[in-house]
């Protein structure tokens, strides 16, 4: 709607007994499959496809990805409904070679629950809040922290972030979303330069984490709503300071979660952390 570019990432870990463990799979394009092929040749097949978040953008490709690796188990976090409307994942992605996905136990670090990889990778699931649409039964924010013991690497999806000053290199393939978002005022389209893409990246980050940054004035023309959502924005130069402040933090909790999610369950969040 806002032409905001949001990249998601996938992580692959080789298991000590052979095979691969995949975290938050992305679309199994030809390019991705060609990148995975050498890993499969060297370390063995994909054994586990693991999604740590309830957000649809992170689990939507678990079905298509598992179709490429039909012998792999698919794992999703518990109480895995999608905010704000609960639609079973099988209706979004009607193909899982081994049937319905398996459910991650809530915590392996404390010895509760068992998964095949727990000797190498520990995990703990965070479930926060409850939606009135579900009678406050199920959490609307779910994330999972995984800890790979050998490399001492932590994997999370949304709960902790680091923002780089430069946009991800993949965004240069189709720079239009960044160029549109980088405009300082309506109809002031930018040339495709590194500086312009960086401006678009900074504003994209602010939109993605804040929704309504203080440095932007939005004017919606009801006679031309679609165009307004693309370029009806006038930015104050102070956006640069806001973006720089985010980049200066080694790690931080997204402001949206700080305001909307975590205050509801402070004790649970502290215990999980």
Regions found by a protein language model. Give the residues of each.
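Active-site HxH/HxHxD metal-binding segment of metal-dependent hydrolases
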Residues: 39-116
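Conserved hydrophobic/aromatic beta-strand scaffold that supports enzyme active sites
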Residues: 10-12, 22, 143-147
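Core dinuclear metal-dependent hydrolase active-site scaffold
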Residues: 107-155, 159-166
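Cap/insert and terminal regions of metallo-dependent hydrolase folds
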Residues: 27, 37-48, 56, 60-68, ...
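Zn-dependent metallo-beta-lactamase
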Residues: 1-17
């Amino acid at each position: 709607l806002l032409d905001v570019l949001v990249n998601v990432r996938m992580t692959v870990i080789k298991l000590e007994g052979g095979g691969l463990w995949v975290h938050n799979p992305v679309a199994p394009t030809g390019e991705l499959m060609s990148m995975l092929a050498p890993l499969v040749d060297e370390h063995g097949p994909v054994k586990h496809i693991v999604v740590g978040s309830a957000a649809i953008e992170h689990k939507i490709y678990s079905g298509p990805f598992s179709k490429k690796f039909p012998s792999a188990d698919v794992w999703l976090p518990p109480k895995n409904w999608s905010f704000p409307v609960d639609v079973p994942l099988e209706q979004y992605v009607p193909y899982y070679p081994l049937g319905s996905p398996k459910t991650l136990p809530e915590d392996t670090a404390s010895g509760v629950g068992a998964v095949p990889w727990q000797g190498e990778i520990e995990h703990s699931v965070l479930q926060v809040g409850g939606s009135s649409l579900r009678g406050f039964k199920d959490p609307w924010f779910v994330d999972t922290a995984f800890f790979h013991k050998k490399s001492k690497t932590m994997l999370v999806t949304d709960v902790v972030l680091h923002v780089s000053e430069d946009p991800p290199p993949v965004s240069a393939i189709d720079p239009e979303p960044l160029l549109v978002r980088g405009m300082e005022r309506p109809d002031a389209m930018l040339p495709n330069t590194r500086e312009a893409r960086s401006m678009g990246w900074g504003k994209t980050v602010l939109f993605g984490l804040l929704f309504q940054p203080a440095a932007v004035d939005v004017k919606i023309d009801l006679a031309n709503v679609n165009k307004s959502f693309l370029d009806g924005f006038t930015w104050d130069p102070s956006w640069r300071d806001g973006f720089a402040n985010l980049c200066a933090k080694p790690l931080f909790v997204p402001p949206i979660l700080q305001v909307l999610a975590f205050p509801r369950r402070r004790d649970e969040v502290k215990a999980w952390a």
